[in-house]
C-alpha cells in the first residue's frame, strides 16, 4: 500500500484527471454541443473538499450558472430528506464493525488515531461505517488551512441566487452502496496501512497538497499521473467506482440535454480517459471542447 491518500481522493473525492493533448486544455470546464442540441450544456470537474480560499468560481462558470436551465450534481445536494435517509447506508452491512475486521492491536491503533484527530463524528459511529468512508474524514485534517469548503456547495449557492433547479444524476443511496462492492476487509486493511504510514511521518499530506495544487492549477494531466500510482488492490475496482457510473450518467444526459441547457458538476475523476465522461460524450456524438476557467485565487499557488 503506497498511495492510500491518492486512492481516497480518486474514490471518495474523485480527483482523477483527464489526459490532455496540450497545455491549452488546462481547464476543469468543458462545453457540450452538437448532435442535435439546440443549446450547449457544460461539464465541470469538482473536488469535494478544499481550502475555502480556493473555492472560487470563475466569471465563465458564474455566467454559465446564470444562463443554464438546471444544475446537475452527482447527487441532489438540495434534498435534505434524501440526505438524512442515506445515513444508514453509510454503515457496513450485517452490523459489521471495524472490530470484526481487524486484530485487537490494529483496532486499538485505529481507534486511538481517530480519537486523537478529534473527528467531527464519534469513533463509535465511524467504526460502523464502510472503512473508506470513515477514512475520508481524515483527509480534511491534511488540508493546509483551517477553513474548508466543497466546490459543489459553492456552485449550489450561486445557482440558488438565480433560482436554478438542483438535480442529481444518481441517488445518494446508490452512491453509498457502491463501496459495498469492495471487500470491507480490504478497505479496513488499507485504513490501517494509511494510519501506519501517517504515524511514521509518511508523505500522504505532501501528496495531498500536491494534488490540491494540481487541481487549483487545473492541471488535469498532472492529477492523472499522480493517481495512476494508486494501490492496484483498489484500482481493480475502478469500473465500479467510476466507469459504470460514468456510463449511466451519459445515458441519462443523452435524454436530458436535448430539452434544456445544463451545468453538470461532478468529481473531476469522472472526466478522464476512454471511459471518462468527456470521451463517452464524444463517442455518443457530442462535441466536447475546453472552456477557459480563469479564477483569481485569494492566495498564491
Model-inferred region functions:
Residues 1-25, 30:
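Bacterial Sec-dependent N-terminal signal peptides
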Residues 4-5, 48, 269:
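Alpha-helical hydrophobic packing sites
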Residues 23, 52-55, 240-247:
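Conserved phosphate-coordination/catalytic loops
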Residues 28-237:
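Structured, acidic catalytic/metal-binding patches in enzyme active sites
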Residues 235-301:
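A cross-kingdom marker for long, charged
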